Design a protein with these regions (language model features):
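Extracytoplasmic and endomembrane cell-envelope/extracellular-matrix remodeling and assembly machinery
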Residues: 1-204
Length: 204
């Protein structure tokens, strides 16, 4: 650890930069940790290949001996350009090769990329993940993916699973109320709508 940051936290930060396509910043970030146990365990050449040339990396015969970080990074990088293909690859080829947390993180990333283009499969991808590994933006896109399908049970579940600081946003409170109303919970729905509108009330 450095400053109380674990290797898992550092891995996740690297993956978030891959997901955001901040590849140059990622390399600089890793170099800053060269003197740590985490940094020394990383093969910078392999990491570069995984994120800059994921197809070549995934076809490499030596890949089977590499760490979970490189495989997850390569698939995450590919998902930026072709989320559908990566979804198939995870399900058909890599499920047993990824750690559970990395697999869940990847499904959230694939769901997010699918959501951005209004792919109707986005919700299914998100459902294979876990809210605990999702960023705020991914949690919000999971709700949008459910709204796209008008799946009100999924809307309610997704808004309830949001982080506390996200779920109280007026927009998500409103949609949680809509989902409750669709299931016949009109009293609860009205309470949510009152919360959603309260900042605009006469009394502030």
């Amino acid at each position: 650890k450095r400053g109380g940051v674990s290797a898992q936290d550092l891995d996740r930060h690297v993956l978030q930069m891959v997901a955001a396509n901040q590849l140059t910043n990622l390399i600089k970030f890793v170099e800053e940790f060269n003197d740590t146990a985490w940094g020394k365990a990383i093969d910078s050449q392999t990491l570069r290949e995984a994120i800059f040339n994921p197809d070549k990396y995934l076809k490499s015969p030596s890949r089977s001996t590499d760490t979970d970080l490189y495989l997850t990074g390569a698939l995450a990088r590919k998902a930026v350009d072709d989320h559908e293909r990566v979804a198939r690859q995870i399900a058909e080829n890599y499920q047993s090769k990824l750690s559970p947390s990395s697999e869940q993180w990847l499904w959230a990333h694939v769901g997010y990329r699918a959501g951005l283009v209004w792919d109707r499969n986005a919700l299914n991808y998100f459902k294979r993940s876990n809210p605990d590994v999702m960023s705020q933006e991914q949690q919000e896109w999971k709700v949008r993916a459910a709204l796209l399908l008008e799946d009100w049970n999924a809307v309610l579940q997704a808004t309830n699973e949001m982080s506390p600081n996200v779920k109280e946003d007026r927009a998500w409170t409103y949609w949680r109320g809509r989902a409750m109303a669709q299931s016949g919970k009109l009293v609860e729905a009205r309470q949510e709508w009152i919360k959603a509108s309260s900042p605009f009330s006469f009394y502030g």
